[in-house]
Each structure stands twice: as structure tokens, then as C-alpha cells.
Amino acid sequence: MSQQERLLKVLKAPHISEKATNNAEKSNTIVFKVALDANKVEIANAVAQLFEVKVDSVRTVVVKGKTKRHGAKTGRRSDWKKAYVTLAEGQELDFVEGAAE
């Protein structure tokens, strides 16, 4: 797998929540769902190349999957990784700008 293909597989989706929106407004931090095996360097490179912004820092957390029941059977949702990407001063990335129009 080439490096370009790997960068495309690192970022899965932006994570939109109330906390993520507040972080974006206050501290210029964007939250992404990322591949479970991705590291901070890969995440920073992927964001910088795909969105053409300068990344200041990356923090990651593995979110544990919830246990769910369906009748008498129990199952478990998959674990997933969340990355908080802080952009450099003056950089901006807005996912919901076009949705308001």
C-alpha cells in the first residue's frame, strides 16, 4: 500500500457532536473518527495533506464499544478511535459551512 493510499484510509469521518462543535469554536480543534491502528503522525499528515491546513497538535482516545442487547442475546459494538486535531493559529476548517445554505 502506498503512502497516499494509507493517508486516505487513516481519516474515516469528522465526528460531529456538541462537544466537538464547542471545541471547534473555542480552541480551533476538529474531531475525526480515525482508523484504530493510526498513529498521531499519520493523522497529522493526513489532515495537513487532504485539507491543506497546518496542524499544531493531535490527541487521540480509543472509545470503547457499548454492550447492546437484542432480546436475550448480548453483543458488543466495535471499539473506535477519535482524534482531536488542533489547527495552527489562523488556520480554519469548517464542515458545516455549506450545509446552512
Swiss-Prot record:
PROSITE patterns from the entry? Answer: RIBOSOMAL_L23
Sorted keywords for this record are: Ribonucleoprotein, Ribosomal protein, RNA-binding, rRNA-binding
Mind naming one GO cellular-component term on file for this protein?
ribonucleoprotein complex
Question: SUPFAM superfamilies from the entry?
Answer: Ribosomal proteins S24e, L23 and L15e
**Can you tell which superkingdom this protein's organism belongs to?**
Bacteria
GO molecular function term, any single one? structural constituent of ribosome
**Cited InterPro entries:** Nucleotide-bd_a/b_plait_sf (IPR012677), Ribosomal_uL23-like (IPR013025), Ribosomal_uL23/eL15/eS24_sf (IPR012678), Ribosomal_uL23_CS (IPR001014)
Gene Ontology biological-process entries: translation
Q: Hey, which family's this protein in?
A: Belongs to the universal ribosomal protein uL23 family.
Q: What does this protein do?
A: One of the early assembly proteins it binds 23S rRNA. One of the proteins that surrounds the polypeptide exit tunnel on the outside of the ribosome. Forms the main docking site for trigger factor binding to the ribosome.
The subunit structure is: Part of the 50S ribosomal subunit. Contacts protein L29, and trigger factor when it is bound to the ribosome.
What this protein is called in its record is Large ribosomal subunit protein uL23
